[in-house]
A protein has these predicted regions:
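A short hydrophobic beta-strand segment most commonly corresponding to one strand
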Residues: 66-69, 87, 114, 128-142
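A generic "binding-loop/recognition-motif" signal
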Residues: 75, 83-84, 103, 119-120, ...
Length: 142
């Protein structure tokens, strides 16, 4: 494990916020996956659910997206790339991720995979159970 750090508040360049702070408290939005909006991906027999995303009227985030991605056994989401940053959190199952130049890595429950903008990536469920991935994007994918 990495060295433990202490949170010292938000740091970095001070820039004016593009989101003004409201004068009254903001309430959280509490959801389940069932509150999300299903999405299918071209060339893939998996299902995504946009839980926090501009496409979901129950949690219409503007600056991020959270998608639950369910990949059945022996299913592939083919490689592609996009402008958004993305992080895959492997919640269940195991598989193989493919990157540019044919590079591959095995993924399993508990792993995080950070994908910078334009990082080519694809994922295959090589296991016998569903591969369940929480995908965080910023900004959200269209």
């Amino acid at each position: 494990m990495a060295k433990i750090t202490h949170f010292k508040g938000y740091s970095g360049p001070v820039t004016p916020s593009s989101i003004p702070k409201p004068s009254t408290p903001v309430d959280p939005i509490i959801l389940t996956v069932q509150d999300g909006v299903p999405v299918v991906y071209p060339g893939c027999h998996a299902l995504g659910v946009r839980v926090v995303h501009p496409a979901n009227p129950k949690a219409p985030a503007k600056n991020m997206g959270l998608v639950m991605f369910y990949l059945p056994p022996h299913t592939i989401n083919p490689p592609g790339s996009h402008e958004t940053e993305e992080t895959y959190v492997i919640l269940e199952g195991s598989g193989t991720m493919t990157f540019a130049n044919g590079r591959t890595t095995q993924v399993q429950k508990g792993m995080f995979v950070y994908l910078p903008p334009w990082c080519e990536h694809g994922i295959e469920n090589t296991g016998t159970d569903n591969l369940v991935v929480l995908i965080a994007t910023s900004p959200p994918n269209p």
